[in-house]
């Protein structure tokens, strides 16, 4: 066991015996340790299939808040692990790879955001869940793409609002609520890649297809959509729609669950503008593998920690989001 190397790499580097039945071993370890595995829709199919629960950011936070497991393994990105730890300070929260960050969270450094908030003292601060715990600590209420519109609408029209860090989501929420929120200039590197040209091209090939777009995409892309929604909302639309073809502009991991729930339907991922990369896949999300998940459960590392003072402040806007969401039936 080379802990020094693990710390340097950000994950357990021990090689896994290739003859092991990894799924069976992961199952054994989670039962022995009373652990729950939570997986985001943007994880690889094999991670989603072994998770106890798969969902979007809101659902994962809700599940973490109510679990009676002793250990939460968050198969997603680092801020999701932080959110779980803030909600469950007495539980052990693990992530398979500390390097699984988030370009959107990185676009909003806590010090810079706190300064921005201080410069606008008469504003309510609404932060997207894709932020660090330190950013949440200077926030009044957290939102996800599932509940952002409804939570923004719960404030009086005259209330000034700072919304961060995703400018595209902020622009979309401004348009559907007729607001002029002050927006932080951040973005998701995956959703920024989707272009009007690629969707128009696919629409020619599949003229009857519904276009499904995540609100983190640019406004011009969202205008082409038959449905703009969170990953959970897009999945629900696909399940309930009579259509057979769907052009999907979000991280391609969601296609796994769409195809599982609707095997008779055709889901076409929108390719990124840059054809030299697989940029409709989040490279951070894909850092998590079955091997890393197995080692994480085996050694109970990497473990997520959050500074106690930050956690004390960050839990308030997260709890507020969960309470509002429950009242709204989300």
Task: Give residue spans per PLM region.
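Active-site loop-to-helix "anion-binding N-cap" substructures in soluble metabolic enzymes
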Residues: 1-248, 255, 260-270, 274-330
């Amino acid at each position: 066991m080379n802990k020094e190397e693990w710390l340097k790499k950000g994950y357990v580097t021990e090689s896994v015996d290739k003859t092991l039945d990894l799924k069976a071993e992961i199952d054994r370890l989670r039962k022995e340790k009373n652990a729950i595995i939570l997986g985001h829709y943007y994880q690889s199919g094999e991670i989603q299939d072994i998770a106890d629960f798969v969902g979007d950011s809101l659902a994962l936070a809700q599940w973490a808040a109510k679990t009676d497991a002793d250990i939460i393994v968050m198969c997603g990105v680092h801020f999701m692990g932080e959110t779980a730890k803030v909600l469950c300070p007495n539980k052990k929260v693990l992530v398979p790879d500390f390097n699984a960050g988030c370009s959107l969270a990185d676009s909003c450094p806590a010090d810079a955001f706190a300064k921005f908030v201080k410069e606008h003292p008469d504003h309510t601060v609404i932060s997207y869940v894709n932020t660090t715990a330190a950013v949440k600590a200077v926030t009044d209420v957290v939102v996800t793409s599932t509940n952002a519109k409804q939570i923004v609408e719960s404030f009086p029209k005259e209330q000034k609002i700072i919304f961060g860090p995703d400018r595209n989501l902020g622009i979309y929420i401004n348009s559907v609520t007729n607001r002029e929120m002050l927006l932080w200039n951040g973005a998701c590197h995956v959703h920024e890649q989707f272009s009007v040209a690629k969707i128009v091209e696919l629409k020619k090939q599949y003229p009857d297809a519904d276009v499904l777009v995540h609100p983190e995409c640019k406004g011009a892309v969202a205008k082409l959509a038959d449905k703009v929604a969170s990953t959970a909302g897009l999945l629900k639309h696909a399940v309930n729609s009579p259509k057979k073809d769907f052009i999907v502009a979000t991280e391609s991991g969601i296609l796994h669950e769409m195809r599982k729930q609707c095997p008779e339907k055709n889901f076409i991922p929108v390719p990124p503008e840059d054809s030299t990369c697989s940029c409709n896949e989040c490279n951070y999300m894909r850092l998590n593998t079955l091997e890393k998940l197995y080692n994480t459960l085996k050694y109970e590392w990497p473990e997520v920690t959050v500074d106690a003072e930050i956690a004390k402040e960050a839990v308030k806007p997260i709890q507020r989001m969960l309470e509002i969401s429950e009242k709204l039936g989300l």
